[in-house]
Regions:
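Bacterial Sec-dependent N-terminal signal peptides
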Residues: 1-27
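Mature, structured domains of secreted/extracytosolic soluble proteins
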Residues: 4, 23-188
Length: 188
């Protein structure tokens, strides 16, 4: 009887181990900033692991948007890299991170977020339906324009600024991230 209990316990443990292992193998990851992005983690959890998004993470924290971007969503986030933030005029990031500029920072960050999950195929379909351009309404309320140049996907803001999607379709538990090489800004 004791042997049967031990065997049953071992069988249950082995089954759970195999189940967990096969889940980890089925989870398709994408490398961003030297770290694996796991579809079972949310936008903030994954962004915090990317060495290419430390400025974005600091900005999300300063803007008080961590809880929002950890929420259910789904969200489509066009995530600027550190290099994208470095392209801004000198002192811009430091100014935006000041507590007195929290509302402005929130506006810039939420301008990079679209409600719903739009992978690159969804965006390409919208571009085709829009005769070469798609208008995306951001959580901030402004508009982004998406278009293709060859096989590359771009977004542009209402001021003429643009960003190229360098890594598309980084799936998250609460949406999708598209890594971009520029910071887009809402209408001035």
């Amino acid at each position: 009887m004791k042997t049967n209990k031990i065997l049953a316990t071992a069988l249950v443990a082995f089954t759970m181990m195999i189940g967990t292992s096969s889940f980890a193998q089925k989870e398709k990851t994408v490398m961003v900033g030297g770290a694996a992005m796991y579809p079972s983690k949310n936008i903030v959890e994954n962004a915090m692991n990317s060495k290419d998004h430390t400025t974005l993470v600091a900005a999300v924290k300063a803007a008080g948007l961590v809880e929002t971007l950890q929420g259910k969503g789904p969200f489509t986030v066009f995530a600027p890299t550190n290099a994208a933030f470095n392209k801004l005029p000198k002192g811009t990031v430091e100014t935006l991170l000041k507590p007195e500029n929290k509302a402005m920072l929130q506006s810039v960050l939420t301008y990079h977020v679209v409600a719903g999950k739009m992978n690159s195929a969804d965006i390409a379909k919208a571009i085709k339906a829009g005769n070469g351009k798609a208008t995306l309404t951001t959580v901030q309320g402004g508009k982004l324009t998406a278009w293709m140049q060859g096989k590359d996907l771009y977004i542009s803001d209402e001021n003429g600024g643009k960003a190229k999607v360098t890594i598309a379709d980084v799936n998250q538990s609460n949406g999708v991230i598209h890594v971009v090489d520029g910071v887009v800004t809402p209408k001035k």
